[in-house]
Amino acid sequence: MIKKNLFKDFSRFSFVQSSIKNNVRCHSKLKLVQPFFIKTKQERNKKFLSSYKFSEIQLITIDLASPEKIKEWAEKKLPNGKIFGQVTNPNTLHYKTLKPLKGGLFCERIFGPIKDFECACGIQKQKPFNRIISFQNKQFCSKCDIEYTWSDIRRYQLGYIQLVTPVTHLWYLKGMPSYIRSVLGAKKKHIEAIAYCSEIVTIDQAWKPNRLIPFPETISSVALSSKKRNTFVNKEIVNIQLTYNNFKKFNVNNTRSLYVSINKKLFKKQFSNNSYNCTCVDNEIQNPIFFLKYFNINFLKPQNLKELKVLYINPDFYKVENYPYKNQVKFEFYQKICRSFIKTSLNNHKPIYALNYLSHSFLNSKVKIFSHFEHIDIHTMYVFNEEILINRFSNLARLKKNGKSKKKIGYIHSKKIHININKHLLYFKNKKLKNLQLSNNLKLIIIISNNASLNYFKNWSNTFNCMNTLILKMQFVNKKLHFQYYRSFFNTHTIERVYFNFFSLDYLKNSNFFVNFSKLLALNLLKFMKSNLFNIFIIPIPTILDNFIFKLSLDSQFQRLLNSLSIQKQKVLNSNSVISKSNKIFKKQFFIKNFSLYDEAIEILWQRFWKFGYYFTSNNMNNKLCKIITKFNKNNNGLRSTLPSWLKLIKKLIKKTQIDKKSNQNLLNFRVNVIHTNTQNKFSLFVNLIKIYLKKVLFLFQIAPENIKNIYIKKSIFIFQELRNKNFKYRNFRTQIKKIVIKLFGLELLPWVLSQFIFTSKIFYQFQKSKFSFYHNSNFLTFSRRHSGRNLIKKIKESSFLNFQIGVNNINTIFHYKYSFNCLPSCHIPNYKCRQKFFIYKNKIENILKLKKFRLFFNIWLSRFLKNNISVLNVVVNLKLNNINSNNLQTLNLLFYQKKWLLKKKQIFYNYAMLKEFHSKLLIVGTLHDFSNFIKLIYSSSYKNETLINIFSIQIQPFYKFNFIQKIRKYLNSEYYNSFDSGRTKHYLRKFLNKDSDNLFFKQFNYVYYFILFSSIISTQTIERGSLTSLNNQQFFLNLLCFFKLAKKNIFKKYSWLTSIQKYFYSRQIIKYKKKQQQKSMLKFVKKKTFFNKFLDLINSFIYDYQKRLKLLKKHSIIQLILKKKMYIFYFLKKLQNKLINEIQKYYFYEFEKKKFINIEFNLNNFKNIVIFMNLKKKILFLNSVLFQSQTNFFNKHANLNIFNNSYNYMYIDFNNFLSIGQFWQILINIFKNKINKYYLLSRSLPFIISNDYVKIDPLIKKFHDDLKHQVCFNSFLIKLTFYNSTLLYPLQNIIKNNNKVLQTRQQYYKIIKSNNLFLTNYFKKIRGNFTELSIKKFENIHTIVSCIGYFGYQDILYHQIRELKKNDYFRNFYLKFIKHDLSNNFNEAIFSVISESRISYNDSIFWNNIYSLSNRYSWKSDIELNIFLCYMLSPETPSDILIPLYKQRIHSSNVLREEPPIAGGGIILKLLKELDLPEMKKIDIQLQTILKKIPNKLHEIEVLLKHNQTNLKLLKYYSLKRRTVIEIEKSILRKLKYIRRLNWVSAKPEYMIIRNLPVLPADLRPIFKIQQQLTASDLNRLYQKVIYRNDRLKRFLKNSTTSNSFEMLFAQRMLQEAVDNLIENGKDINSIETDSRGRPLKSLGELLKGKKGRFRQNLLGKRVDYSGRSVIVVGPKLKLHECGLPIEMAIELFLPFLIKEILKNKYALTVRSAKIYIKKHRIKITQLLRQVVKRQPILLNRAPTLHRLGIQAFLPKLVEGKAILLHPLVCSAFNADFDGDQMAVHVPITNEARIEAWKLVLSRNNLLSPATGEPILLPSQDMVLGCYYLTIENLQSLTQKKFRINRKILNQRNYIFSDFEKIFIAYQRNQINLHTNIWVIFNNTIESDSILQEPTEIQVLFSGQYIKVYSDYYQKFNRNGKIYNQVVRTTPGRILFNLMLNNCFN
C-alpha cells in the first residue's frame, strides 16, 4: 500500500504482524521490555545461531485488524476469571487524589500500575533482579485486581471501547480514494448518506446495486445470480454450502423438500454439417444414474461441472417451440404428452428444469430436455425424455429443409439421435404387444444418421410398430462424410461393443419373442435388400439362447429369401447395382484400412454358433449341408454383397480331415473341420490361438505334427466334433481336454462365448427327438407356433440344454447387465455388472496374495466366523497367502504380444469356471455373484509401485450342523451317480417331505467362505482323485441348503427358488445316483433338514391354478404370512467398515474426499450378505451391504459415496441384484400376466406388497448414523429408504439435532397401508407444475400397498387422484378416514401424530407444518438467504402439492423473537460488506475482467464513430462524452479490481473497514500531567470521552422500544459516527470540528501520525542504520552517469565484512581479529582488495528529504582520496542537490535481492525521466551550458565588453582551408589556430545554416559548364547536370569538436 494507506492501517491499530518461524504470532504492540527471551533455552540458541533474520523481516505484513483481534490485544484474563480491557467509564482521574478511576480512560486494571510493582491498595512487591523473569508468572492483587509489573506497561497496553452499532472508518469512507465506495460500487455521496443516517435504506435499495436480475424464480438462479449469463457454469460456481444450518428462523424441510437444479444458458447454434461427434456407446444401455437434488449444492464444484452438462432452457424457448410439425408425428400417444407438457409449461411461464444424465451417451449428445423430477424410480424415468426425443426426431427432416427456422430454435441437435423407448411406451403405443411380457429394462434403441428423410421414416414405422427386437441401422449416402464418421465409430470401440452394447438382451425372457422374431427377420431383410441405400443390418446375438435356435432360424429365413427372390430381382441385385458398388467401397475404404480385425469379427460370429457347426458336421447332417452350400453357390453372384459376410464361411466349408486311425490306433479318434476365411487378412489372432492349443492337444495325445498337416492351414478355424472314451489311456484325459476347450472358448477376445462345453452328441439327439431340426424352410416357424410361449421354454428346459426363464434380470435391478446367460436349470443366470473376462490359469499358484490388505480382510472374517467350524477349515485347506504366484495369471492377448507372462495395466477377473471339473456330462459355470465363485483381483497402474490389489468377493452362505455337512460331503464324494426317474423323485420328495416337517430345528447361522485360489487342490493328483468334483458339488448343495434356511425367514425367496430346486431334483443330466440306497438316504436326509413340503402344494396351486389360488390365499392367508414377516435389517460391522473406508482412502482413491456423502440411501430390497466390488477402471466404488448377522433385525444399507473426480459426479451404489426377490416377482408376473390382467404390466405394482407391521426405523438409522458419522459428513436433509420401488424419505436432522438420544416423543413410525380398491399410477413429477399423467390403471382384488410418509415429504401416490374416489368428501377428512379405516390394531400409538407433546386429535395431525414468524424489522444475514426464502414462499402450486390441514406453532423459546437492534448507519454498510466473502469476491473479479475485456472494443467503436461524424457537432459532442464515461468506467473497474485482489491476498475481510471495537491508545501516550500547578491533558482524552458519552446515549435509545426506531436514535447514531471521525482525524468535516475552550481544534490521532514530527517520520524513520555512512558531496565531472566517488576510508568501514571475507579467503589472516589488524597495516593491499569488492557491489545514495522515488538512487562506487563523496553534476537535479555543502547518505544493499533491485530498478542511468511528469530530469546546467556555449561561439570578442589579450596574428588570418578534420586539430595543437578561428573545411554531408533559405551572394559559371554558388557561410560546386560534387563550409574548430563529441555519444 502507499504510505498514506499505511498510516491509515496503522491508525486502526492493525498493528504489524510478523509470523515467526517457530509459529509464534508476534505483534508490534509487544512491549520493548518483553523481547523473545521468554522462550526455552533451545529456542533461544536457535534464534541466535542464525546470522540474520531477513526471512522474518520478509514475513512482516500490515493488515486490517478484525474486531476480535483488537479485543484480543486489549483484554487480559485474571486467574480468578475476571476479564479487563473494555473502557466503560469516560472519566479519567479523581479530581482530588489524581488517581485513575475504575474502568476509566486511565484505569490501572486495564492499562497497568502507575508505579512499578505497586497496586492501588498501596501494597508493594519486591522487584525482580532480572526484568524478564517477571513475565513468566503474572501476579495480581486479590483486592483491586491490578497486576504487579513494571509501570512501563502503560506505554504499550491497549484498551477498547465496544460500540453499540458499527461505525465506518473515516479514512476508508472519505479518503481519496474511498475504498468502501469502490468495493461496493456505489456513489460516495450515497454511502456517506447511509453512514450518517441522512437516508433510510429499504430492501429494494439494498437489493438493486447487488442484483441485476428480478426476483428469482428458482433457487439455482440465486446460486448463479452473480455469474455472467454467457459464461460457462463450471468456471464460476464455487462450492455453495446450503444446509439447514443457514436457516435459523424457518425450517424448509418440514413442508417439502427443496430441490436445486443448475441453470445454464442454452446457446443458439446452427447445425454444422461436418461435425460428427461420435458418442461413446460403451455405457449406452446402462440406466442413467440420477439422484434427488436436496438442499446441498456441494456437488457444484467446478471440476465436477465439466461432466455435468445440464442445459437451462430460456422461457423464450416456448415462443419458438410451437411444435408446428405435430401432425407429422405418427404416434398419437407422444402427441398427447407433448401437448400436455407444452401447455402446462406455457401456462405457468416457468422454465423447464434439466435433469443431469450421467450416462455417456447423454453427456455427449446435446439434445437434452429432461424434466426435473422430485421423486422418481427407474421405471418412470425414461418416459418423458424419450417422447421429447422422438418428437425431435420426427421434426428433424423438416427443420433441415427450412433453413430459416434453424436460427430461431434455441436448442441444439446432435448429429445422432437416440430414441430409447421403455416398456410403457411400447405398451401404450402398440396394441399388438399387449400379450407380451416385457422385461423391466427393455429399451429400443435406434441410431439413425441425420440424412434419414421423414418419408423413409414413415415407411419404416410399420416395422417399428411390431418391432420387439433391436436394430442397429446405419445409412451411407454421402460417402466421405459417412466413412469418416463410421471409421471413428469403429476405431473407438471393440468388436464386442459394436455388436452388443447397443442392445438390452432382456427381451429374450419374453416367450412370444420367438414367434415374432422370425416374422421381423424376414420383413426387415427383404425390406433392406430392396432399398437403394446400402444398409448394414446387424442383429444382436441372443446369448441366452446359446445362439442355436437363432442360427437355425436365420438359415431358414435366408433359404426362404432365396426361394422368394425371383430371377428378375436377382438381376436388380447384380454386380452393377448401387448396393454392390457401395458394398465394395465400404469394404475397401473402411474395413480393410481401418478395421483390420473385421475378419476376426466374422470368425467370432461364427464361433458364436459353434454348436450349430458341430451339429452341422455330424454324419446325419452332411447331406443337408451340401444342399445348402450348393444352393448358396448357385446364387453366389447375385447375393454375395447383400448376405451377411459370415454366411460366406458356410460356403467355404470345404475340407474334413481325419487322423489316420492306423497310425494312432490307441490314441484319440476325432475330426477337425477347417473353414477357410477371407484370404485378404494377413493376421488372425484366433487362428494363432487355435494353433497353440492344437499343439497342446497334440502333445497330450502324443501325435506327431506330421500326421495332422491338414490342420495347419492358415486362416483356419478349429472345431471339436467328438471325443470318445474308448481310446483314452488316462483317466484324467477328458478333464484335461475340457480345460483346453474352456480356455479356447473362454478367451478375453470372446467375452460372450459360453464357458460350458458339451462333448457328447446325446444332447443333439435329444434335440432331434424334441423336433428341434430346423433345416427345412418352415420347420422352425411351425415348431415355434406349435410350442409357443412357455411350452417352448419347458421343452428346452427338459432337454437340460438351456434355461432362460428364471431371473435374467430382476425387477428391482437398476443396473443393466450386458451378458446374461444360463447353463443349467439349477444354476441362476449370472447377472454381470461388468464385462466378464476369462483368463488362463496355470497349475501352480504362488505369491499373488502377499498384501497386508487381504490378510487384514481375511483375518477379520476368519477369526469371527471360522474359529469353531472344522468343516470350513477343511474347505479352506492350505490357503496360504504367500503360495500364489502372479506370473500364473495372464490375459490371452499377452500370450502373443508378450513372451513373458506379465500382468500390466489389466484388471483381472478370475473366473471360477476355469477350475470347475465334473465327471458329469455338463459343466456348471461359475458366476459373478452367485455361490461366491468369483474372485476379483484388481490391478491398476494408478497405484504406487504397481502392486496388485486384491478385494475378494466373499459371499457368506449359511448352513447347518457339522454332521450335516459331513453327510453331504460323504454323499458327494461318491464317484458315480446314476440317473433316476423324475416321476419317482417327485413321489419320493412328496412322500418324505410331508412328514415331520414341523420338528425341524434351525440353529443360528454359521458362515462359510469359499476362496477360489486354493494352492494345493488344483493339481493333477487332486483331479485324479476327484476331490475337486466333490468340492464343487458340495458348493452347490450348501447353497441349496442356504435357500432352505432363508426360505424359513422369508417366503419371498421360496417362490423364486422352488421351481429351480424341483428341476434340480428331477433332472436326469445333473445328478446321477450310483445306487438306490444312496438315493433314498439322500431323500431322507433332505426330508429331515427342510420344510420344503410346507409350501410345495401351495406353490403348485399358486402357479397352475389361479382361481383356486385366490381361495387358498384367503384360507392359508399367505399374504398375512408375508406381511407378518418383519423386515430383516443388516447393519455394518463397525470395525471392518471403518478399516475398509480407511484402506480405500489410503491406497485406492487419491481424489476420494472423506466426509462427502451427497445422499444416504438405504435399500431394504435384499436379504443378502457382503459383496465388495470395485471397478477401479471407472473409479466407481461399490460397497455392498453388510457383513454379518446379528441377533437383532437386519438392515441392508447402501450409501452414495461422493468421490470427486473428472468422470463422475458422485457415487451411486446399488446392490439389488444378488439372490434377490426379482425371481419371485418374475414368476408372479408370469402368472398375473396370463391370468389377471392382460392390459397392464404388473412389474410396477407388485413391489408394493410389503409388511403389514410397521418398522421402527429411528433406532436403526441412529445406529447407522453413529457408525458413519466419523467417516462421513451428512450433508443431506433426508435419508432415502427404499422398499421395493416405494421410497420413504427420512429427515436426517432428527438425528443430527439429538446426537445423544433419539427423541422418544417424536419417534417416526412408518405405516404401510393396504387398500383393496386403489388407483396405482405410473407417473412422474416436475417441480414447476409440468405434470404429465401417463396412465392410471385400476386393479381389483389385488393387495397393493402404498407407502405413506408422515410429516416431511411428498407421497409416492398422487393425492389428487386418490381424492377422485370420493369426490364429495373434503379431501382431508376423506384421507383421514381412509387411513383410519385401514389402520390395524398393532399400533400402540397413533402413528402419524408425531407433532406435538400435547397431542391434538389423532385425526387432525397427519400433515402439518410449522408456523414461523419473522419480525417486520428482521434483516437477512445475506442476500442469498432472502432470495431462498422468497423463492420458497413465492413458488407456485403444483399438482403434487399436498394440502396442509393445520399448522402448529413450535417456537417455544422467547429468545427467537427477541428484539434485535435496528440496522442503520454503519450497520447497513457492514451488511453489504459481509456479503463480499471470498467466493463472492472471486465472482466479482471474474465479472469485472469480462467487462474490462469488452471496453477496448467499445472504445474502438466510439473512435470510429467520432471519425465518421466530424461534421455533425451534436453527435461529435455526444460520442466524446460517451468516450469519457467509458474511460472513467474503465478506471473505476481497474481500481475496484485492485482493491478486491488486494483483499484476496491478505487475510483481511472488507467488513474490517467498519469499526465495532474502537481501540484506546495506551495511557502514557495521552498523558495528564502538572505544569506550574495546573493540569494539562492530551486532546485525545477529550475525544475518547466524547465517543464514550455518545455511545452510552445511543445505548439508552436502543433499550427503550419507543425510541429504538425514532429519529432521535438515528441522530444519536450520527453523533457517534462524528465522534469517532473526530477521534481519527479532527477537522476533516468542517461542520463537526471538536475545539478546546479557545476555539482551537483538538489534536486527533491523525495529527499524531502525519508530518515531520509525526510518529513515522520522527520516531520510526529517523533511526540509525547499519552499513551506512554520510558525507558532503562534491562535483565529479569526470565520472560517468552511473558512477560516484566513494572515499577510501568510508569504503573500508562500509565493506568491512566483505573485506574480511576476502582476507580470510586469500589466507592473509586466519581470524577476524587478525584480519582487522591486517587492514590497518597493509593499506595498499587493502585498496586493491577493496577495488575488487566494489566492482560488483552497488551502493545507494540518498539525500534528505526524500520527496519522491528518485531521492534514492544506486551507483557504482569508484574509490577516491579525500573525505567527500563525488557526484555527477547531471544527477543533482533528481536529488535536488547542489554543491554548497549538501550532505548525502550512503547505504550498502546486502542481500542478493536488494542488489538485483539496485541494478535493475534504482540505477541512476535507468532514471532519466521524471516518474511524475515524464519529462527528462537529467538536464545540463551552469558550467555545462557555459562550456557548450564557449565551444560553439563564433566571435570571441562579442562575449564581453572587456578586451582579452588575443593573439592578433591568429585572429587576422581568415583564409585557412582544410581538407579534413584531422588537419584542423593538428594545426590547433601547433597553436596555429585557436578554438574561435574562422576556417574553411571541405564537408560534403548535409549542413544546417541560416543562409540556406537566402539567395547566394554570387554565382560563378565556368566555361566547362560547371558552376559555383557562393553563400556567406559556405559555397557549393555543381557539375553540368546540376549535381553537387564539392562543398566548402566556414566554421570554427570549437564547433567541429562539439559536433564530433555529439556523434561519438550517439554512435
Curated annotation (Swiss-Prot):
The reaction(s) catalysed by this protein are: RNA(n) + a ribonucleoside 5'-triphosphate = RNA(n+1) + diphosphate
Q: Name one Pfam family in it.
A: RNA_pol_Rpb1_2
Q: What biological-process GO terms show up in the record?
A: DNA-templated transcription
Free-text cofactor note: Binds 1 Mg(2+) ion per subunit.
Subunit structure comment from the entry: In plastids the minimal PEP RNA polymerase catalytic core is composed of four subunits: alpha, beta, beta', and beta''. When a (nuclear-encoded) sigma factor is associated with the core the holoenzyme is formed, which can initiate transcription.
Q: Give compartment(s).
A: Plastid, Chloroplast
Provide the alphabetized UniProt keywords.
Chloroplast, DNA-directed RNA polymerase, Magnesium, Metal-binding, Nucleotidyltransferase, Plastid, Transcription, Transferase, Zinc
Q: State the top-level EC class.
A: transferase
**Which cofactors, if any, are listed as required?**
Mg(2+); Zn(2+)
What name is this protein filed under?
Answer: DNA-directed RNA polymerase subunit beta'
Q: Organism, per UniProt?
A: Oedogonium cardiacum (Filamentous green alga)
Q: Where does Zn(2+) bind?
A: C119, C121, C141, C144
